[in-house]
């Protein structure tokens, strides 16, 4: 009895565990975590977005939101005929304008030739969930990518495969990543599922890793985040903080210092600023329209200062005017639906190409 008890206590701590239906579950040692620029050894959890050292460097809301796994994914290869997932989240909360599948679900894609194809979504059942994503596949090696929760954090996640199958960690993408810094929209509000935030759509479309530093209500061009994202050399930085900048004076105060911090370590990397998203409310709300115009004018003024001051590889992208939209891309006149995210991703890719920011 003592021997049996010791084996029982030890087994769950290993890199894999067996379920009752003859699937074997594998942990993070068997898949590549993508969408992060911070080494696991520097984080409280491998699925965090900020280093543990930043807990006392950023405001409390920023730290709390950084525990969400927005933009993160795991990638692996397996020849299983059935693919399952079980995961545990930190909070298990819900919102009245975003589906639980986007907040705390997981999205499965597989590499079909040269493109990533959606397969299924793991629907959350609470803090701990288990879901069969696909079954009855032929037994051949395939590459899979699983996008993690946007508005909750992953405490643990495991991939379940046939007991006779193998699983292999995918190789790291050799391309330089793209880094996004922004707001609740950057974080993924309010996609219906986790793979539909624009940063992940762009990642799949360009086959490039994308780091998502979206902080709901708190994307404010702050120096600690600028310092962190400057520690890597991406292909480009995309700054879409405007919805959280509160007032024009804050834009004037923080825009150029943000660029200077990035430039101190990455003197030539392109930095792209996105103006304020055009809410359909501004069609009729004259006060909001006036305030938004003042915000955009402040950002454009800082951009012009940099260009006149000799800054290079700084870009400014104006989002489509309201007259160019059918106004059907948001859930609440602010946050994007899947339709809005797809349109925004397509728009940004076209803009990046037009500016010559993407490798041919």
Where are these regions (language model features)?
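Catalytic nucleophile-elbow at a beta strand-turn-alpha helix junction centered on a G-D-S/GDSL motif
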Residues: 175-199
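Oxyanion-hole/transition-state-stabilizing segment in secreted/luminal serine hydrolases
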Residues: 194, 202, 219-256, 265, ...
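Catalytic His-Asp segment of secreted/periplasmic serine-dependent ester chemistry enzymes
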Residues: 277-360
């Amino acid at each position: 009895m003592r021997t049996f008890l010791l084996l029982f206590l030890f087994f769950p701590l290993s890199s894999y565990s067996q379920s009752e239906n003859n699937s074997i579950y594998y942990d993070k040692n068997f898949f590549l975590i993508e969408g992060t620029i911070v080494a696991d050894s520097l984080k409280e959890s491998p699925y965090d977005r900020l280093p543990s050292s930043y807990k006392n460097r950023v405001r409390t809301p920023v730290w709390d939101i950084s525990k969400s796994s927005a933009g993160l994914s795991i990638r692996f290869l397996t020849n299983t005929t059935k693919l399952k997932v079980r995961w545990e989240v930190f909070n298990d909360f819900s919102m009245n304008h975003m589906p639980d599948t986007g907040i705390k679900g997981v999205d499965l894609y597989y590499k079909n030739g040269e493109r990533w194809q959606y397969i299924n979504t793991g629907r959350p059942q609470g803090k701990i969930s288990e879901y069969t994503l696909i079954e009855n596949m032929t037994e051949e090696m395939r590459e899979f990518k699983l996008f993690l929760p946007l508005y909750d954090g992953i405490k643990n996640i495991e991939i379940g495969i046939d007991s006779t199958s193998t699983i292999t960690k995918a190789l790291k993408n050799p391309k330089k990543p793209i880094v996004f810094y922004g707001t609740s929209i950057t974080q993924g509000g309010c996609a219906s599922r986790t793979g539909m935030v624009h940063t992940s759509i762009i990642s799949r479309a360009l086959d490039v890793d994308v780091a998502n530093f979206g902080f709901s209500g708190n994307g404010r061009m702050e120096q600690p985040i600028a310092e962190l994202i400057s520690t890597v050399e991406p292909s480009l930085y995309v700054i879409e903080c405007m919805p959280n900048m509160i007032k024009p004076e804050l834009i004037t105060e923080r825009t150029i210092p943000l660029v200077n911090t990035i430039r101190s370590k990455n003197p030539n990397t392109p930095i792209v600023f996105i103006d304020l998203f055009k809410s359909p409310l501004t069609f009729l709300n004259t006060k909001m329209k006036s305030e938004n115009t003042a915000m955009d004018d402040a950002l454009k003024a800082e951009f012009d200062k940099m260009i006149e001051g000799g800054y290079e590889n700084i870009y400014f992208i104006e989002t489509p005017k309201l007259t160019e939209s059918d106004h059907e891309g948001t859930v609440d006149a602010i946050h994007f639906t899947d339709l809005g995210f797809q349109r925004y991703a397509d728009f940004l890719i076209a803009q990046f190409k037009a500016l010559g920011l993407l490798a041919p």
